[in-house]
UniProtKB/Swiss-Prot annotation:
It comes from the Bacteria. Belongs to the bacterial ribosomal protein bL35 family. GO terms for cellular component: large ribosomal subunit. GO terms for molecular function: structural constituent of ribosome. This is Large ribosomal subunit protein bL35. NCBIfam families: rpmI_bact. InterPro entries: Ribosomal_bL35, Ribosomal_bL35-like, Ribosomal_bL35_CS, Ribosomal_bL35_sf. It comes from Caldicellulosiruptor saccharolyticus (strain ATCC 43494 / DSM 8903 / Tp8T 6331). Transmembrane segments: none annotated. GO terms for biological process: translation. Keywords: Ribonucleoprotein, Ribosomal protein. HAMAP family: Ribosomal_bL35 (MF_00514).
């Protein structure tokens, strides 16, 4: 079997927690921020766990991470 290629775009966006869960940043924090409330912008800073429905796809794209 040949080596599997890592999806580099996704590898730059995902980190793995100590317990093995995949972490990602929230979208919507780059521009057009004046129309968003402080609370909304503050909550967009947080990292979240990748949803269980997407974990299988992430594992396939990141075979060695």
């Amino acid at each position: 079997m040949p080596k599997l290629k890592t999806h580099r775009g996704l590898a730059k966006r995902i980190k793995i927690s100590g317990s093995g869960k995949y972490l990602r940043k929230k979208a919507g924090k780059s521009h057009l921020l004046s129309g968003k409330s402080r609370k909304r912008k503050r909550n967009l800073k947080k990292t979240v766990i990748v949803d269980s429905t997407n974990v299988k796809a992430v594992k396939k794209l990141l075979p060695y991470l």
